[in-house]
Amino acid sequence: MEIAANLLRLSNEWIVAQVDEVEGETLPGDPDCILRQPFMVDYEGNLSQWPKNSDDREVVVRSTDITTIVSPSKDLLANYIKSLE
């Protein structure tokens, strides 16, 4: 299974998710990124569903709230894919 995921810093949390842009025009300040299947990553690399207390598997956020976006390590990506199954 080929999955393109990103590791991003959002609200002082590390999140691994599939990131897409919102289609169509958006106004400044409007959410413009979709995080699909987001999981929070703790310091040991364990994953937990994000956001907590929600069953939503797609979360729309503002790209301006993302402070860092990088590719996840191979181990983290493998753990993420396993969590999706």
Q: Where do the language-model regions lie?
A:
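Conserved RNA-binding domains used in RNP assembly and mRNA/RNA metabolism
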Residues: 1-85
